[in-house]
Amino acid sequence: MHVIIPARYASTRLPGKPLLDIAGKPMIQHVYERARQSGAESVTVATDDERIRQACERFGAPVCMTGAQHRSGTERIGEAIVRLNIRPDDVVINVQGDEPVIAPALIRRVGEALARQTAASVATASVSIDSDDEYRSPNVVKVVCDKNGHALYFTRAAVPHARGSDTLPATALRHIGVYAYRAGFVGRYVSMPPSPLEDVEQLEQLRVLWHGERILVCQVPIGEAPKLSIDTPADLARAREQWKALTAV
């Protein structure tokens, strides 16, 4: 099992996001340290940015430099897999660089789920939504699954819709952006044309479903789900405040 953390500097809403300081460390360092605790055989940061490379090398993270043309983290990982000579049958886990408190157990859980599952090309995770604000936020990605735990759709919309009721649906699930793939599948993914849905929702995983591949979704306990995914300046401010509270205990 290998973890690759794709990192780019040019975030639209938070430029330089991987290097933003949280509790005296760049965000990417928190993610790397969590990934190291998962028991993965290797943990590598994949980036095209020299500033990110230099920051990672200062705290000892291996870095794979990639091209700047990639449209998604998975495409960047595809190049890194080739450069790192990872075997086609090996499980590769994509840990997003904006999850500074991702649980090592969650990384391991998703990787092991794919290793056991031959019917799916990808594994990811979800958690029950417990607030109406989260349910209705376009910054929170929702997932709908079939009875076997395979994804039917991912969206930023509030789904499933409870017709005739204002009550939060008990089946509402928040997608957690960690992915496990077999290395050989990533090469196929990169060669697949992007789907119209992927472009509309700006969700790279929709390419997998559009082309008829299965995504296994592991539903995890609320306590294991990351609480500090950082996409906006408000998220960053909240993360810094929560970190202060954690260290003050």
Locate the predicted segments by residue.
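Short, structured coil segments at secondary-structure junctions
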Residues: 39, 59-60, 211
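Short, high-confidence coil segments that cap the C-terminus of an alpha-helix
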Residues: 40, 88-89, 117-120, 213
